[in-house]
């Protein structure tokens, strides 16, 4: 006999329970702190959440959330997203920046693109990546410093792991979006911005003056995830990301990664969950 259909409300509850477990494991992995699922919100955690709430509610603070080259990032992302931008145009852009050259060649030699022979020349690397791979690589180089930005002890300790998660997540989100007929570049940039919100979150946690260790429980993990989603909407506006990305970010900011969300939000959800699982069980320990 066919299995009974799970009511939508119950399905959402089951999804939320699974999401909470992954959020807890991920936060413990990111902070390199032991997880205690039932840990309550202690004084230090409550102070951190209050500071994040004040940050989200303060428009004057939004311009200083993350470092940003105001005259560079928005027009560059718009150019990358423009379908009329030719591969030759992007190639010229890359050739002018040694950091971009190195990253393009590195990506062309990654497991995703690897060929039988090593790629050592820029022209060959660009042929291997194609226009979509090149767009993603340029966006990655431009936005990575915004995620790796300097902070206190906690952010410094977590930066390497945060970028590992970000790198996996952005590529997974792009792949999921592409497979469902949506814009892969929008999904890629949205994932980068979503994890940039973690940088802001960790920097805020670093400002909490308390010597007590962090209590990493489900309640704290879920509360941080909600505030990360609120911050995503702010960051998308501040960076002047493409309009479609800002709209999706606003939805995430209002409703989180909901089970009944729009398709672009579900792509972000899928990439985030899978990247977290991969990091929790296969990343650095």
Segments from the language model and where they lie:
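Catalytic or ion-translocation cores adjacent to nucleophile or general acid/base/metal-coordination motifs
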Residues: 211
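Conserved alpha-helical "signature site"
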Residues: 1-206, 214-285
């Amino acid at each position: 006999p066919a299995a009974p259909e799970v009511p939508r409300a119950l399905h959402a509850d089951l999804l939320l329970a699974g999401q909470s477990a992954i959020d807890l494991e991920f936060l413990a992995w990111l902070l390199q702190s032991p997880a205690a699922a039932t840990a309550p919100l202690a004084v230090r955690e409550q102070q951190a959440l209050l500071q994040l709430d004040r940050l989200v509610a303060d428009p004057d603070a939004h311009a200083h959330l993350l470092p940003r080259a105001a005259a560079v990032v928005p027009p560059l992302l718009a150019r990358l997203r423009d379908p009329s931008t030719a591969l030759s145009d992007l190639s010229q852009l890359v050739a002018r920046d040694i950091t971009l050259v190195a990253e393009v060649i590195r990506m062309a030699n990654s497991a995703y693109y690897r060929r039988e022979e090593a790629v050592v020349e820029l022209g060959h690397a660009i042929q291997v990546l194609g226009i979509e791979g090149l767009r993603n690589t340029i966006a990655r180089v431009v936005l990575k410093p915004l995620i790796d930005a300097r902070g206190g002890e906690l952010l410094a300790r977590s930066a390497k792991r945060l970028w590992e998660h970000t790198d996996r997540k952005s590529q997974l989100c792009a792949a999921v979006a592409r497979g469902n007929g949506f814009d892969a570049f929008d999904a890629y940039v949205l994932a980068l911005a979503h994890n940039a919100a973690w940088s802001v979150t960790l920097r805020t946690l670093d400002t909490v003056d308390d010597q007590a260790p962090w209590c990493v429980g489900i309640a704290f993990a879920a509360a941080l995830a909600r505030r990360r989603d609120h911050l995503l909407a702010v960051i998308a506006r501040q960076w002047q990301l493409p309009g479609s990305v800002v709209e999706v970010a606003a939805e995430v900011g209002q409703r989180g990664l909901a089970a009944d969300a729009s398709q672009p939000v579900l792509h972000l959800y899928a990439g985030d969950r899978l990247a977290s699982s991969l990091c929790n069980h296969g990343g650095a320990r």
